[in-house]
Design a protein with these regions (language model features):
Chain B
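Structural beta-alpha unit
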Residues: 1, 75-110
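Short, hinge-like loop/turn segments at secondary-structure boundaries
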Residues: 50-54, 104-106, 128-129
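Short, flexible loop segments at boundaries between secondary-structure elements
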Residues: 138-144
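Small/aliphatic-rich secondary-structure junction motif
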Residues: 2-53, 86
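A short acidic, glycine-rich active-site loop
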Residues: 54-69
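Short secondary-structure boundary segments
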Residues: 37, 113-115, 144
Length: 507, 144
């Protein structure tokens, strides 16, 4: 069965590529109008002055602010406790062998730390100016609260399957939460809506965008769009990438996944260290770069729509990167067996922090300092990851090569995580069966290949649209269920304070 | 109060020798034994989401396997010899977990077998017995 599917996948891709020359282009002309239309529908914009505020961004921002205030700034007051939990201070030794808080966090983080942290930030800075960075950080900070709410709910309302495995995530808490409140029909509808959305969204944000940007960087280091032999061979790179992904998710070759999961955290650290080195090599540009971030945020100089334009771009890219409000991490966190759903919520606070406030900001500073030191460096038509790469290359000429490797690893681990998120939506709709599993996984791999054949613009439109679409039912559900989370949170922290929940270590 | 001896056991020949040795001592001093099987596991490893979702099942299976294939038969033979035997299966860092279990059971001594690896191998992979000797707050008997 596996082989047949793999073969079918390969054949369809091969026959497509047989038309050879200009194939990438054909795909492009086919997808571009669809992407454009879809983007327009989801990002319905309210014009305010020169800027246009997409409704969905407003929806996310308002949600994040609401949860931050309603949960009593959980993003600040839960931070220390989150670190204690991850360190294992509260882990009962009798439960050793279950998924630890650290593991749940690491899995969720490797799903979110992706190309968005390298390429997405560059997009934000190109379109929204340096000021977008400020709003990116702000969005990360507020997003911590949204993440807290959705991950707590994910654990609280998960399904425990007869075989002992667990399935959780927004589709489950939406359905169960709404029917608890007497809206069974509506619960079923939004649950299914979310499941469809995550299935499709997984093909964009967690798939095509990743493989596309990995390919772009690959072409970049093998000689650039003019020189590289690979420049017009997106289909080839795509097929190889799709086959590797297929070998893991369909072929069940766990060792590849395991190696990746182990490399990614080190890659992230490696990336941050080198980014900091590059920033400090431009040390005389640092004050100006930081000043630009603040003034840009307030004045929005040179940005379409001014300060508001910068804000919109910053928030949009932040959500795209840390996934707060999308509900995907909630699927990953549901796997932890804990009696206290709040603990998972608290741990998940750290994800937007690591992803957006730390890694994205560092990337933004790499680009920012480079732009100050040499204003025109990015004006050679570089976009996305190529721009970040150029900023690195200014100081360390060989860095684009390890960056390409890191990008591929990030892309790969994000794709593995998202194939699982998408699959969970799929099985929610079609039931847990092996055949259904395989069908979705095959579709997923096909899109990996497709991602390398189209251009960045339409890809961003499609993936953004899918992902933002599922924020609508998710956040709606979060509003409805927030009182439950609040009650649990207060009770949990009261028991920590009274000493009813004790530390096992470090006492 | 009866004395308790903790015996580290993993089904290997060395660990069985340690268990036999401990049984003799336990008989002589009418102590009871706790046979401890530690499954090497770290809370700080990196997993895929799929592995996390299946983790609970795997854990149950691992415990079940340790219990039925190693602990049950071994403890039965010692019980037949008239020694009181309890068993424990736990996940964690081998030496650390043994120390924790010894504390929990108020054990007076730990018995452990050794593999007798070459110096090179010990240098590369470490040795549970060696680490345990360094960490343990109570006497450790290493049985060759």
């Amino acid at each position: 069965m596996k082989r047949i599917l793999l073969a079918a996948l390969m054949l369809s891709l091969m026959s497509a590529s047989a038309h050879a020359a200009g194939f990438d282009e054909t795909i492009n002309t086919m997808t571009a109008p669809i992407a454009e239309w879809f983007g327009k529908v989801v990002f319905f914009k309210i014009p305010i002055g020169d800027a246009a505020l997409p409704l969905v961004v407003l929806w996310l921002v308002v949600g994040a602010i609401f949860f931050t205030v309603y949960m009593g700034f959980i993003n600040i007051r839960g931070f220390k406790h989150a670190i204690e939990l991850v360190r294992g201070d509260y882990a009962n030794p009798k439960d050793a062998g279950e998924v630890s808080h650290f593991q749940a966090l690491a899995t969720a983080v490797s799903g979110t730390v992706g190309i968005g942290n390298i390429g997405g930030v560059a997009v934000a800075v190109t379109v929204g100016g340096p000021g977008a960075t400020f709003w990116l950080i702000m969005a990360g900070f507020l997003g911590m609260s949204t993440k807290f709410v959705e991950c707590t709910l994910g654990v609280k309302y998960r399904n425990e399957n007869p075989d002992g495995s667990v399935s959780g995530g927004p589709m489950y808490y939406l359905r169960k939460g709404f029917s608890e409140r007497g809206m069974e029909g509506f619960g079923k509808f939004v649950g299914a809506f979310y499941a469809i959305g995550i299935c499709l969204g997984a093909l964009g944000i967690g798939n095509m965008f990743q493989s596309n940007q990995a390919f772009v960087q690959f072409v970049n280091v093998t000689g650039g769009t003019q020189e590289s032999w690979f420049a017009d061979k997106g289909w080839l790179f795509g097929i190889v990438m799709a086959l590797v992904v297929a070998s893991v998710i369909i072929g069940g070759i766990k060792s590849i996944a395991r190696v990746t999961e182990k490399i990614v955290p080190f890659m992230a650290i490696f990336y941050c260290v080198f980014a900091l080195i590059v920033i400090f090599m431009n040390y005389d540009a640092i004050p100006q770069a930081i000043a630009n971030i603040f003034t840009g945020a307030m004045t929005g100089e040179g940005v379409v729509g001014g300060a508001l334009g910068a804000l919109i771009i910053g928030f949009q890219r932040a959500v795209f990167s840390n996934e707060a409000g999308i509900g995907s991490a909630s699927i990953a966190h549901s796997a932890v067996r804990t009696n206290e759903p709040v603990t998972e919520g608290v741990v998940s606070l750290l994800e937007p922090f690591i992803d957006t406030i730390v890694i994205c900001t560092i990337t933004a500073l790499v680009i920012g300092t480079a732009a100050v030191a040499e204003p025109g460096f990015a004006l050679v038509g570089q976009q996305g990851i190529a721009m970040t790469s150029a900023a690195f290359a200014r100081e360390i000429s060989w860095f684009p090569i390890p960056l390409a490797f890191a990008a591929m690893m990030f892309a790969f681990s994000t794709m593995i995580s998202w194939s699982y998120y998408g699959l969970k939506g799929w099985t929610y709709l079609f039931g847990e069966s092996q055949t259904m599993d395989r069908i979705y996984k095959a579709i997923f791999c096909f899109f990996v290949a497709l991602g390398c054949m189209v251009q960045l613009g339409p890809i961003l439109d499609i993936s953004d649209a899918f992902v933002f679409l599922i924020c609508v039912p998710n956040i709606l559900g979060l509003y409805f269920l927030a009182p439950i989370v609040k009650r649990e949170t207060e009770s949990y922290f009261a028991r920590i304070k009274s000493g009813e929940i004790k530390k096992y270590k470090h006492t | 109060m009866t004395t308790t001896y903790l015996v580290a056991i993993d089904g290997s020949e060395g660990s069985l020798r340690a268990a036999n040795f401990a049984t003799e001592r336990a008989k002589a001093s009418s102590a009871k034994l706790v046979l401890a099987y530690v499954i090497e596991w770290s809370p700080y490893s990196f997993n895929t989401p799929e592995e996390n979702a299946e983790r609970h099942q795997r854990r149950e299976e691992e415990i079940e396997r340790a219990q039925t294939t190693v602990l049950d038969p071994v403890s039965q033979t010692f019980r037949d010899k008239g020694v009181g035997v309890a068993t424990e299966v736990r996940h964690g860092h081998a030496a650390e977990t043994l120390v924790d279990l010894a504390k929990e059971h108020g054990a007076a001594q730990i018995f452990i077998g050794r593999k007798g690896e070459s110096r090179m191998k010990t240098l590369l992979f470490g040795s549970v017995a060696g680490t345990l000797v360094q960490m343990s707050p109570i006497p450790v008997t290493v049985v060759p």
